Amino acid sequence: MKALIIGGGVGGLATALTLHVHGIDAEIFEQSPEVKELGVGINTLPHAIKELAELGLLEELQRVGIQTSELTYANRFGQTIWQEPRGLAAGYDYPQFSIHRGKLQTVLHDAVVARMGPVVRTGHRFTRFEQTPDSVTAYFDKDGGEVSAAGDLLIGADGINSTLRAIFFPGEGPPLWDGVVQWRGALIKKPWKTGTEMMVAGPRNRKFIYYPISDDVAEPGKQLVNWTVTIKLAEFGTDMQSSADWSRIGDRELLHKYLQEADFQLGEFDPKSIVDATDQIFEYPRCDRDPLPYWSQGRVTLLGDAAHAMYPVGSNGASQAILDARCLADCLSGSNPVPGAIAAYEDARRPPTTEIVHQNRRSGPEQVIDLVEERAPDGFEHLSDVASDEELRSIIKGYSTMAGFGKDQVNK
């Protein structure tokens, strides 16, 4: 059996590796002329790390990432709303990693090349497909000419702007912007606390996020730290003024203006100083897509952001793509014919990812911040006067269970 995979990102590479474990050949087609380390920091949750560990990648992840030990949600005054251990520190069998997206992609890409050979085809822009009862053929633009490849199934792991998804749903249009713009960057700093903690602070429409993503830096005693500022500028559904990509250079002066208006008071964390100390910042709209009524047609299916693009709250984007990869490989390794296996994969993965998309639109676990802001916009003297531990816990634990990374779910 041979799978054709559109897209050489986290989802596509993880899929190729997982299929390889199950004895299924794969070929990856990436439209970029070369594989480059794009993006800044992301978090990968224990249920996804469990899958990567089973692929033998844990040691490499430990080398390039940070094992997150604690997560704090705070208001804009830096008052703690919720704090909890994460990953191994919380009793999981597998860690949670904060890691540069490009470094994660490189770990996966290097493993693909080492185990499967030169199966990543760069400079191939997917354009269309044809399928018969027995096979599928994908067509690509390569250096201005059309080339094709045949296989037993075609997997669209080509991101939020998926060409394959657009073929399935030609009237869907561009991604949906919720009116939030995100500015992101990374810089070298001394560790905060033990150098393994993550913080999300601010009110509903203005947040500051901070976490380390690597100890592998030239300056002893320092780390590479990722930061994100999110500001709501418009209402949901407003037309975007920029594309939903990873490489748009941010407007530093505009961000300064919004930070002044946001008035974060976070003690040792001064977002403006952190922004000023960052060499390059990126800016992009926060987007998702509406859940689909189906992902598949016969021998062809979608995976990752192409299937279920979601807001980056709750650390679930890349994690869910990795779970997709495992589920699809498991289904294909059974006795079902390929179309039946693909249908089983969709039946297993579409409902939970649909729910995550909806939950992330409601702020996911960050609802604890929103709840406290509604009740105490000017801060609080005692958190218990604003929200009970039980109320906050139900939000946090409800989200982790819904998204499949409750401790009992992962450790079973």
Predicted regions mapped to residue ranges:
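FAD-dependent flavoprotein oxygenase/oxidase catalytic domain
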Residues: 1-412
